[in-house]
A protein has these predicted regions:
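Iron-sulfur cluster-binding electron-transfer modules in prokaryotic oxidoreductases
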Residues: 1-311, 315
């Protein structure tokens, strides 16, 4: 219960998350004195954060003469702190293709972390805040889509309509928000034409389909098709339907089983001898990065790099 409480107040709150990471860094020399679950949690917590290269704004205007769409983007809680480059790549790519990106200040967390931890009251506060904020934005300026670049978040957002189906005040709004929600790869595949030039050198890319993506949202072929357009060799991982062991907070709450799943996943990945790994979920990225030295990038980063000057992928700092 103590671990669940710690996770519920830490992960969705960026300031508390950063403070906790500092405390974790200071406590690492003494982790041998701690229970195994606490040790595992300490191992997974970051101790440094990448610098953000994009200014924080509520509206990122299209960089083309004509705007073709207006979307809202969930920048997330944990992801925007440990891997801000994912949101930056998302916004760059969308702006470059005529899409205006709206990031309302009132949106913090999608609510999925507390939802899966059984903290329903806290989760529903986030759900209601997000539904009302995005609906107001939609009414004000018509949103063509609400995008998530973290598949675990997107799965929950697509469920808002079902969760509030019997709520007289929110059922209509929640249904609209869920119908507008798309994974970033889903939206790009359906709505944008990427101008990807042949960069010459081709990489062997192992694509990991996150459980929340392939099972939760039934989105699989779209990111694979987009990656194939980068002229790299895209390889699907053997037993790709099996979890990497992240599963939200599962890798902390059930660390023994999670480690077994991670070992199996990494063995399957490394059997392909890829240059790097690609996936669409920050939880999977963090988990897999702790089990292999093979660099791992978000799908949107691969696409963004393919549209500009692609350099050698480097290992993610998580």
């Amino acid at each position: 219960k103590l671990i669940r409480y710690f996770l519920s107040i830490t992960l969705p709150n960026t300031k508390v998350f950063r403070l906790s990471s500092l405390l974790v860094k200071l406590s690492k020399p003494f982790k041998f004195l701690m229970p195994s679950k606490i040790k595992d949690m300490i191992e997974l917590m970051p101790t440094k954060f990448p610098k953000k290269s994009l200014p924080i704004k509520e509206v990122y205007k299209s960089s083309t003469k004509k705007r073709i769409a207006r979307v809202a983007l969930l920048t997330g809680c944990v992801q925007k702190e440990i891997s801000p480059q994912i949101n930056e790549a998302t916004i760059r790519l969308l702006n470059r293709h005529g899409v205006e990106v709206v990031v309302p200040k009132k949106i913090r967390c999608c609510g999925s972390l507390n939802h899966h931890l059984g903290k329903e009251e806290d989760a529903h506060q986030d759900f209601k805040n997000n539904i009302n904020t995005w609906y107001e934005e939609h009414q004000k300026g018509n949103l063509d889509a609400i995008l998530s670049n973290t598949s675990g978040c997107g799965t929950t957002m697509k469920d808002y309509g079902f969760i509030f189906r019997e709520d007289k005040e929110l059922s209509k709004k929640a249904k609209v928000i869920s119908e507008l929600t798309k994974d970033i790869s889903e939206y790009i595949f359906e709505s944008l034409k990427l101008d990807i030039k042949d960069k010459g050198k081709k990489y062997k890319v192992a694509y990991h389909s996150a459980c929340s993506m392939q099972h939760g949202q039934k989105v699989h072929s779209q990111p694979v098709s987009l990656l194939e357009k980068t002229n790299n060799e895209i390889m699907e991982i053997p037993e790709g339907h099996i979890c990497c062991g992240s599963a939200g907070t599962y890798n902390i709450l059930q660390s023994k089983i999670a480690k077994q799943l991670l070992k199996k996943k990494v063995n399957n990945i490394e059997s392909l001898n890829p240059d790097f790994i690609s996936t669409g979920n920050i939880g999977c990225i963090t988990q897999i990065a702790h089990g292999t030295k093979v660099p791992i990038l978000h799908t949107i980063e691969v696409l963004d790099l393919s549209l500009i000057h692609i350099s050698e992928p480097t290992r993610r700092l998580v």
